[in-house]
């Protein structure tokens, strides 16, 4: 990998998870070996997992003796983490964009590393009732925290121009105007309330649809990002991380699409505090991509805060 050598070697994800967690609360983390190499967890070190989710990455850190403050806004993820009672894990409710307030409130002012795994956890995607998937019938929700407007509110309330702009900006969907027009026409007949209902509308709008990437993928991505203000949270979280890292501390960010990766890349290049350790994003090995298809689009970038001068 194109990254500075960590103080500790990589660890087998399966070995670490079996040592650190019960089987009832499981999640397969992407780029597991690369995260351990980048953050070098060890006894006495303190880390933040800003996107706790299924705690897959947190287990990797805990398994090497580190302390982890896990942040999540999803009540379901928080409940599962508390029930798992993982030794060394402190669970904080909130959005990682607010970690500069959440951590001091928990008595933490500096940490050795911060991990952000942006996007939706696998267990959230697999929970049909959350409304993230276009494959399964469910209420059109997509909210991480269950507060604020839902995806159904968005598709039924925004005008056609606003919808098209949203789908294009956050989904990079070239057929955004046509999709927005079909959505508006459909909701004039009946409110759009479910995932499959919306997916079928998009499928009808998509010209020349054939087997392959589902035509609803980019629109669903756009709605999820908009509903949860994911890009705004990422920008705020990156800025907050700068002030929390101890000298020599590292920030590791896993993104899953180009919008996020561009934000992370530009932030690290423009930071006066952090030095990028990855000239190019680290991607999953072919073997991991075969075993875990969700790893195919994962990109890891790492930055480091300068170490304190000797004698200081």
From Swiss-Prot:
Region Disordered, residue ranges: 1-24, 288-312
GO biological processes: rRNA base methylation
NCBIfam families xrefs: 16S rRNA (cytosine(1402)-N(4))-methyltransferase RsmH
Enzyme class, first EC level, given as a word: transferase
Annotated binding of S-adenosyl-L-methionine, by residue: 55-57, 72, 96, 117, 124
Organism: Deinococcus radiodurans (strain ATCC 13939 / DSM 20539 / JCM 16871 / CCUG 27074 / LMG 4051 / NBRC 15346 / NCIMB 9279 / VKM B-1422 / R1)
UniProt catalytic activity: cytidine(1402) in 16S rRNA + S-adenosyl-L-methionine = N(4)-methylcytidine(1402) in 16S rRNA + S-adenosyl-L-homocysteine + H(+)
EC number: 2.1.1.199
Keywords, alphabetical: Cytoplasm, Methyltransferase, rRNA processing, S-adenosyl-L-methionine, Transferase
Gene3D superfamilies: Putative methyltransferase TM0872, insert domain, Vaccinia Virus protein VP39
Cellular localization per UniProt: Cytoplasm
Protein family (similarity comment): Belongs to the methyltransferase superfamily. RsmH family.
A GO term, aspect molecular function: rRNA (cytosine-N4-)-methyltransferase activity
GO cellular component: cytoplasm
Major localization class: cytoplasm
Reported function: Specifically methylates the N4 position of cytidine in position 1402 (C1402) of 16S rRNA.
Protein name per Swiss-Prot or TrEMBL: Ribosomal RNA small subunit methyltransferase H
């Amino acid at each position: 990998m194109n990254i500075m050598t960590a103080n500790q070697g990589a660890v087998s994800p399966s070995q670490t998870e079996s040592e650190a967690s019960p089987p009832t609360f499981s999640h397969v983390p992407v780029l597991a070996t690369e995260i351990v190499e980048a953050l070098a967890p060890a006894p006495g070190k303190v880390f933040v997992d800003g996107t706790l989710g299924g705690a897959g990455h947190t287990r990797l850190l805990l398994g090497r003796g580190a302390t982890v403050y896990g942040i999540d806004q999803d009540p379901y993820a928080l409940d599962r983490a508390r029930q798992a009672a993982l030794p060394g894990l402190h669970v904080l409710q909130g959005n990682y964009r607010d970690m500069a307030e959440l951590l001091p409130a928990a008595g933490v002012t500096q940490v050795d590393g911060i991990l952000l795994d942006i996007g939706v956890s696998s267990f959230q995607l697999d929970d049909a009732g959350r409304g993230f998937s276009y494959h399964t019938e469910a209420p059109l929700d997509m909210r991480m925290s269950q507060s604020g407007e839902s995806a159904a509110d968005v598709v039924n309330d925004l005008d056609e121009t606003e919808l098209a702009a949203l789908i294009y900006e956050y989904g990079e969907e070239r057929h955004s105007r046509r999709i927005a027009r079909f959505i508006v026409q459909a909701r004039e007949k009946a409110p759009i309330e479910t995932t499959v209902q919306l997916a079928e509308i998009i499928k009808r709008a998509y010209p020349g649809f054939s087997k392959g990437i589902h035509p609803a993928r980019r629109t669903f991505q756009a709605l999820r990002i908009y509903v949860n203000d994911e890009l705004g949270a990422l920008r705020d979280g990156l800025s907050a991380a700068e002030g929390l890292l101890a000298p020599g501390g590292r920030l590791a960010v896993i993104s899953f699409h180009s919008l996020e990766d561009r934000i992370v890349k530009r932030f690290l290049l423009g930071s006066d505090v952090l030095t990028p350790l990855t000239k190019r994003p680290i991607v999953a090995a072919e073997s991991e991509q075969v075993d875990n298809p969700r790893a195919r689009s994962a990109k890891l970038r790492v930055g480091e805060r300068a170490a304190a001068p000797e004698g200081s």
